[in-house]
Amino acid sequence: MALQIHSPCSFSTRPYHLFFTTRNPRFAIKCQNSQIESDTTEDPSRSKNSSSSGVGFGSPASSSSPAKKLSAATSGNKKGKGKREVNRRAPVEKPVFMSEEGAAKAEEQRQNENAFLLTWLGLGIVILIEGIILAASGFLPEELDKLFVKYVYPVFTPSVVLFVAGTTAYGVLKYIQNEKMKGQE
């Protein structure tokens, strides 16, 4: 009694045979909605007018009587290109929020805020330069390294703490100001 084993070498040399199927699936789609079937049997000119109304899906105007639409379309064709009604909106006006005194106060506040932000930008640049100097001091000669460690290192940490605290305070202040403005509107 001999046991026959099929050699897998034909499959291993040609792996594209593993997933190859010769059966082609065929699908048939049938409509089960009687309303769609009745629409296709109706007059094609009537369905063209109702679909070209341009109103949109599910709007009451699209489901209104097609006879009115048909008569309006034919009467419009008889008149030709007549005058059409144009509805114009009023131009958008800028609201007047504050008086001259309020405008001067807002301008002064804007200038103060710009000065503060420029100062804060300068402090950030100083912190960046201090950090680069401290990072590079290990590669410099011993005398410069001692000089930077003596003068720059003690100033670096407090300046970073000041920058973070000031930035946080500025953010909270601006948030409170925005909330007040929203409350006034």
Curated annotation (Swiss-Prot):
- The keyword Cytoplasm is annotated on this UniProt entry: no
- Residue ranges of region Disordered? 35-105
Q: Where is the signal peptide?
A: none
**Entry GO terms, CC:** chloroplast; chloroplast membrane; chloroplast thylakoid; plastid
- This protein's UniProt keywords: Chloroplast, Membrane, Plastid, Transit peptide, Transmembrane, Transmembrane helix
Q: Where is the transit peptide?
A: 1-46
The membrane topology term of the UniProt record is: Multi-pass membrane protein
Locations listed in the record = Plastid, Chloroplast membrane
Membrane spanning stretches: 115-135, 152-172
Comp. bias intervals (Basic and acidic residues): 83-92
Q: Please note every region of biased composition (Low complexity).
A: 47-75
Cross-referenced PANTHER family: PROTEIN LOW PSII ACCUMULATION 2, CHLOROPLASTIC, PROTEIN LPA2
Q: What is this protein called?
A: Protein LPA2
Q: Please tell me the species this chain comes from.
A: Arabidopsis thaliana
The primary gene name is LPA2
